[in-house]
């Protein structure tokens, strides 16, 4: 299998880390949806990251669907089997992905759209949504540490990946002191082998590639 997309995208990164934890062999190709449009479109004309090229040549998109597929294929899961615990994990990942989506929209608005064309009421709205999601996620991490204790579970993985992304792109707006539980979670997971193997920044991880 081939995973296409830049690791500065939290969606690509969560898939890469998850594939590694599931023990699934794959090749990662750092192709940007911005500077590498021609190369990306030759693989997937939709030019959406992450893209997973399956062993039979089939092409999948959307990080959550990709992860659902690879878990079904491998017979392993990064989710709890207990429904009560799973409910909390789903809430955490839902909040993290909501924060991620709004953070990416803010970045696109500020970095890609000409200043004169930026619509402040829209920026205020999505900023409020991002902050609400992060506040709720911070509460969950502090209230239910057991849900995030295992670095091999999706709740911890996605929450940490998203926090690192928001800090890298919008750190001036998001003081770590306001999210101590979330910041501590990310700091802990960023020191684990899968996170170090697939960093969000560094050689070969330039630019802006936050495609879902």
Say what each PLM segment does.
Residues 52, 64, 130-138, 194:
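Aromatic-glycine hotspot motif
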Residues 176-212:
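Long hydrophobic alpha-helical segments typical of transmembrane helices together
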Residues 20, 168, 191:
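Short polybasic/polar patches that bind polyanions
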Residues 1-120:
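GST-like domain detector, emphasizing the conserved glutathione-binding G-site
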């Amino acid at each position: 299998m081939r995973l296409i997309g830049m690791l500065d995208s939290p969606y690509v990164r969560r898939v890469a880390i998850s594939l590694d934890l599931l023990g699934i062999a794959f090749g990662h190709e750092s192709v940007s949806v911005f500077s590498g449009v021609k190369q990306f479109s030759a693989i997937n004309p939709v030019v959406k990251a992450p893209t997973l090229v399956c062993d039979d040549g089939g092409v999948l998109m959307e990080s959550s669907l990709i992860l659902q597929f690879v878990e079904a294929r491998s017979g392993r899961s990064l989710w709890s089997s207990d429904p009560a615990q799973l409910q909390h994990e789903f809430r955490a990942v839902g909040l993290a992905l909501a924060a991620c989506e709004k953070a990416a929209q803010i970045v696109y608005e500020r970095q890609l759209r000409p200043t004169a064309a930026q619509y402040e009421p829209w920026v205020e709205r999505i900023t409020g949504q991002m902050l609400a999601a992060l506040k709720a996620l911070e509460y969950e991490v502090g209230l239910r540490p057991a849900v995030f204790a295992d670095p091999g579970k999706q709740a911890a993985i996605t929450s940490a990946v998203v926090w690192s992304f928001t800090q890298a792109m919008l750190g001036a707006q998001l003081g770590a002191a306001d999210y101590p539980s979330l910041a501590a979670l990310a700091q802990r997971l960023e020191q684990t082998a899968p996170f170090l193997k697939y960093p969000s920044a560094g050689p070969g991880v330039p630019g802006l590639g936050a495609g879902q």
